[in-house]
Design a protein with these regions (language model features):
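Phosphate/pyrophosphate-binding loop motifs in nucleotide- or prenyl diphosphate-using proteins
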Residues: 1-219
Length: 219
């Protein structure tokens, strides 16, 4: 049987109550607590993939970007399948994250970075709706990366570290894509202590807008 049979089965029921004790059958890791770091890593990656899907569904992205993200979503299922099977399992996993997965992401980062403006400082997550959702997806992916590293540390012979490295590269890709989604309007730049400066200037009768974050190319 496939490692993802429980995920894709069309057979009812959709609930069994078997996990009501706080334990679950996690792939070929067997019966584990739902609070196990391996389950947490699996769940965080599932959420990360969903966050990518939201960014895609919102629209406003070029076909080249959506095509790349569609490939990423398939990779994320490879990653989830990988996490479901220990590295030292006697039978091979349905899929494993390999160096080739990382290479594809690195090439995508290099490609899309050429479409974004030069980075001259820290930028805030925002701008267009497409950019904001890509920034949000990046934050979720970074959390998933930390969760996978925790699983690698706890089970070094069972959890594939390439899965964590893939998520690291994916967060870089999402950052580059978010900046690309803002290319027409510019990045939202970080202004250190902007709120405090605005308050002080307002108290002194100065237009507070002069101290608020602005957008490159707009103000």
């Amino acid at each position: 049987m496939s490692d993802l049979d429980d995920f894709v089965s069309a057979e009812p029921p959709w609930y069994t109550g078997q996990g009501d004790s706080g334990r679950t059958t996690f792939g070929r890791h067997g019966d584990v607590a739902k609070t196990d770091v391996r389950v947490t890593a699996y769940a965080e990656c599932d959420e990360a993939n969903a966050a990518v899907s939201v960014a895609m569904a919102a629209g406003g992205l070029p076909i080249g970007v959506t095509s790349t993200l569609a490939s990423v979503q398939n990779d994320m299922f490879d990653l989830i399948a990988d996490l479901s099977v220990p590295l030292d399992a006697p039978e091979p996993a349905t899929a494993r994250i390999r160096e080739s997965h990382l290479t594809r992401l690195e090439r995508a980062v290099d490609h899309f970075a050429q479409e974004a403006a030069d980075l001259s400082g820290f930028v805030l997550p925002g701008g267009t709706v497409a950019a904001a959702l890509l920034y949000q997806a990046r934050a979720v992916v970074r959390r998933a990366e930390r969760a996978v590293w925790a699983a690698v540390e706890a089970y070094p012979t069972a959890v594939n570290p390439l899965a964590a490295r893939y998520l690291n590269r994916l967060s870089a890709l999402l950052f580059v894509l978010a900046r690309g989604a803002n290319v027409e309007h510019g990045d939202v730049r970080w202004v250190p202590e902007a709120s405090a400066r605005a308050m002080a200037q307002n108290e002194n009768g100065v237009d507070a807008r002069a101290a608020t974050p602005d957008v490159d190319g707009v103000g």
